[in-house]
């Protein structure tokens, strides 16, 4: 079991890599001058005659397939016949998993996962008789007429990563033949290093690895291999075998014209350094990632006059024939829902979904085909990564990963978020139409990523909270948010009797705006020629419906308008309405989960109960973000909008009251329940299923709320607010005083705290103590990062979120995120945050010393324990 867990832990990080946009590469100027091909041929020499003879011997008994490279198979040996016309051309190596063992499947690493890409080119070294493979690393942009261009070439050379003996040259010297067994059978890892990239850190075992096939298509060649490795811990060894495909794709000779990124629209980007003689500092050029969407040459004039036309090459997604039949039509609709957005950009029939059938003449090994891959897995997720031309940001192909068990998460959302207003949502087995509508929106969201769009967590804020209770408003907008790219789910705000019919998210105004920004064709020759046009376009879309904000840390969101899983523009009111619906659901849990099946256990009841508590926990964090929150705008010079505005004092005070009422006071409605008498909360862990008492979940939730509420980054934002706004700010002292009166109120009044009140007091003390001892706080905070019973249960669907977070921290991949910094070691030492916490500790100590005379033994022990902890932390003897 320990070995099994180790393998799972090692590979689970792979899924983050697969959702990332491809690392930004730009072409290195060809180092090999190929003009000698045009010279008059010399009289063949004996050595050349021998080479021709070698060529004839090699191909005469081989099985040959034609394509970009001719592939010759001679028994178990494979050879590429590479046209010399392709030497120096940019090629993209694309590696994907095709079949995986249980260990990877359980970690969510499945068929279709793209684990490694790199751009390469080939060079013929005549002196050594070898074909050299060069990895193309990012090369900064620079005008070739500028003097600095030479320096760019000299200081950004790309490495050679492999060399191949030239086995033969064809009769007219227009093609070279190399043997490729080593790069595909696991011997050599220069272009396919699967076990490192899925974090096993091992090598392929040669005699347990083999090439299964190599196919050649018009612009790519793909090798399929079965590779085996050995993972050892102590005396235990596990063998892991994967089937992988490694494609070499010929990139367009002329890259697609890039389009500049803008902070007001959320696209994945392809950043490149930029140099010029005129600069006084280096710049960074960022192209958005997008498909090549252009009108046909004969339609361009009509298109530019405003007529809608069909694109020269539509985007086509193929739906895996492993997809259950009942869901295929809904997935197809979710993909094609984007058509309305492309129509806004002037293209009809721009995006098409097709089901793969046995009669289709389609080879899914051809890397040109975009596929929705359905994985039989327990993972609750979906993902929409894409394959990029790293020179321009052009999306060449996309693979949507769909893990089967995402259906269980969707089913929970439907029941918990709409069960009070939708009778069909109150069953264990939901109707296909209801599930299908949810599957449609998940597919639509993932396709958005495959079109280049990042999450837009501001989409839900665009719709006022009370408007989501309006049948007229929701019917007109046909969604719960302005963007399908938000993590806005079903309408949990609508109350029984409101008459709201539209409960799920769909394509919204922001999505159509974003697609038009990225995909409208202007017929220009350079990105610079489009800048003014795009600026004018953005200037016409300043309404809140078109606002964009990137994803934030769930536990420390800075802008409360841009959060996961939220709805509406008022976190407190939205959460209170959501809780009202949860209060209606809790008494019905047993009834809604009873199927009548003989021998049924309470496992379904436990799942629904856990889902309700998790939804409640989401509401807590939506409100928490108001405290110490800052509204952050994407501003430009002259627009008259402030970039940073602190959340109003009244909203922060109301948010603290909400937290004190809903989580820092025992929520009897949620934890003193009938269902809790029949089942604890089941939680899957690497070592098996655990049964957690509801009160343990509450203590855990309270601990995290207090930890995150009193985190130094939040408190330092509040201190900055006080510095800027004085008495108009909600201060750290006011926050601490409110918490003290709520948590220690029973003690202040001379009462006897019960078990849960004592636990809450210790949780508060623990948050203060560890933060007051800063080095220890850092260690403990890291330690507990993965111990939240609710947050880890609520991992957001769509691995693109995790990939995006990883990518946002790697400037070379996606561009840097916006980070507001109020934190640092010197600042901590002089900050009021620590002073206020230590002051509160002394206040608590004084109170407890005055209450040591209590007649209740448990309370006295509790007070003595806390006094001892305070003395130890503050060094008081």
Question: At which residue positions do the language-model features occur?
Answer:
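Bacterial N-terminal signal peptides that target proteins for export
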Residues: 1-9
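C-terminal segment of classical bacterial N-terminal signal peptides
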Residues: 15-24
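Auxiliary tRNA-acceptor-end handling modules of aminoacyl-tRNA synthetases
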Residues: 29-79, 83-323, 341, 350, ...
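The catalytic-center signature of Zn2+-dependent metalloproteases
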Residues: 34-36, 50, 355-375, 437-495
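Soluble non-cytosolic domains of exported or imported proteins
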Residues: 81, 113, 282, 321, ...
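Sec-exported extracytoplasmic/periplasmic mature domains
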Residues: 336-347, 448-449, 453, 490, ...
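Conserved catalytic/binding loops enriched for acidic/polar residues
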Residues: 460-877
């Amino acid at each position: 079991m320990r070995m099994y867990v180790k393998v799972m832990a090692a590979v689970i990080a792979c899924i983050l890599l697969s959702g990332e946009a491809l690392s930004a590469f730009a072409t290195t100027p060809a180092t090999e001058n190929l003009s000698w091909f045009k010279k008059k041929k010399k009289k063949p020499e004996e050595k050349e005659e021998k080479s021709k003879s070698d060529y004839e011997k090699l191909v005469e008994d081989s099985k040959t397939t034609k394509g970009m490279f001719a592939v010759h198979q001679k028994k178990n040996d494979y050879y590429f016949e590479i046209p010399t016309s392709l030497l120096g051309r940019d090629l993209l190596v694309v590696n994907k998993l095709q079949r995986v063992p249980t260990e990877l499947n359980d970690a969510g690493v499945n068929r279709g996962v793209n684990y490694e890409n790199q751009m390469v080119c080939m060079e013929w070294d005549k002196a050594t008789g070898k074909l050299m493979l060069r990895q193309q690393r990012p090369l900064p942009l620079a005008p070739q007429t500028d003097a600095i261009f030479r320096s760019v070439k000299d200081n950004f050379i790309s490495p050679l990563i492999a060399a191949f003996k030239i086995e033969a040259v064809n009769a007219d010297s227009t093609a070279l033949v190399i043997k490729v067994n080593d790069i595909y059978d696991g011997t050599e890892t220069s272009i396919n290093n699967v076990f490192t990239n899925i974090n096993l850190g091992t090598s392929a075992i040669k005699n347990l690895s083999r090439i299964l096939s190599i196919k050649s298509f018009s612009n790519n060649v793909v090798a399929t291999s079965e590779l085996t490795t050995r993972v050892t811990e102590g005396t235990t060894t596990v063998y892991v075998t994967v089937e992988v495909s490694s494609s070499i794709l010929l990139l367009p000779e002329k890259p697609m014209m890039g389009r500049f990124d803008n902070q007001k629209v959320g696209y994945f980007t392809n950043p490149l350094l930029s140099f010029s003689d005129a600069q006084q500092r280096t710049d960074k050029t960022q192209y958005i990632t997008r498909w090549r969407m252009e009108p046909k040459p004969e339609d361009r004039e009509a298109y530019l006059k405003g007529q809608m036309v069909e694109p020269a090459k539509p985007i086509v997604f193929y739906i895996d024939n492993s997809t259950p039949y009942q869901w295929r039509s809904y997935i197809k609709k979710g993909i094609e829902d984007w058509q309305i957005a492309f129509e806004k950009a002037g293209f009809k029939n721009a995006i098409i979904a097709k089901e793969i059938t046995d009669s289709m003449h389609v080879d899914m090994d051809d890397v040109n085909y975009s596929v929705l891959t359905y994985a039989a897995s327990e993972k609750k997720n979906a993902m929409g990564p894409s394959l990029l031309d790293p020179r321009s940001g052009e999306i060449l192909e996309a693979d949507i990963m769909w893990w089967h068990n995402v259906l269980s998460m969707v089913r929970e959302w439907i029941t918990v978020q709409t069960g009070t207003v939708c009778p069909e949502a109150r069953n264990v087995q939901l109707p296909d139409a209801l599930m299908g509508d949810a599957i449609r929106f998940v597919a639509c969201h993932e396709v958005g990523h495959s079109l280049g769009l990042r999450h837009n967590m501001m989409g839900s804020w665009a719709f006022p909270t009370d408007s989501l209770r309006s049948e007229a408003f929701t019917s007109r907008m046909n969604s719960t948010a302005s963007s399908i790219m938000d993590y806005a789910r079903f309408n949990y705000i609508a109350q029984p009797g409101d008459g709201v019919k539209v409960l799920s998210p769909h394509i919204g105004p922001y999505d159509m705006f974003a697609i038009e920004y990225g995909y409208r064709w202007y017929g220009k020759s350079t990105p610079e020629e489009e800048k003014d046009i795009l600026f004018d376009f953005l200037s016409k879309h300043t309404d809140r419906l078109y606002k964009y904000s990137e994803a934030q840390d769930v536990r420390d969101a800075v802008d409360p308008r841009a959060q996961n899983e939220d709805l509406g523009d008022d976190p407190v009111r939205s959460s209170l309405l959501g809780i009202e619906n949860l209060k209606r659901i809790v008494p019905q849990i047993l009834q809604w989960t009873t199927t009548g099946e003989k021998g049924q256990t309470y496992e379904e009841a436990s799942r629904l109960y856990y889902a309700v508590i998790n939804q409640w926990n989401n509401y807590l964090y939506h409100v928490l973000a108001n405290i110490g929150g800052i509204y952050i705008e994407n501003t430009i010079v002259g627009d008259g909008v402030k970039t940073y505005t602190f959340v109003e004092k009244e909203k922060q005070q109301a948010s603290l009251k909400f937290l004190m009422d809903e989580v820092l006071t025992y929520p009897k409605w949620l934890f003193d329940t009938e269902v809790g008498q029949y089942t604890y909360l089941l939680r899957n862990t690497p070592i098996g299923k655990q049964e957690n008492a509801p009160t343990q979940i509450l203590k855990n939730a309270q601990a995290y709320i207090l930890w995150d509420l009193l985190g130094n980054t939040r408190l330092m934002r509040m201190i900055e607010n006080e510095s800027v706004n004085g008495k108009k700010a909600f201060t750290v002292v006011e926050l601490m005083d409110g918490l003290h009166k709520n948590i220690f109120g029973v003690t202040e009044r001379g009462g006897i705290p019960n078990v849960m009140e004592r636990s809450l007091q210790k949780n508060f003390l623990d948050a203060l103590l560890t933060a007051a001892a800063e080095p220890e706080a850092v260690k403990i905070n890291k330690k507990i990062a993965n111990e939240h019973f609710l947050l880890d249960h609520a991992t957001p669907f769509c691995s693109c979120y995790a990939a995006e977070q990883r990518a946002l921290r790697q400037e070379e991949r996606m561009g840097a995120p916006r980070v507001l910094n109020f934190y640092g070691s010197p600042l901590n030492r002089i900050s009021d945050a620590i002073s206020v916490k230590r002051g509160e500790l002394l206040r608590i100590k004084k109170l407890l010393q005055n209450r040591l005379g209590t007649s209740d033994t448990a309370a006295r022990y509790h007070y003595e324990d806390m006094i001892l902890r305070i003395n130890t932390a503050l060094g008081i003897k």
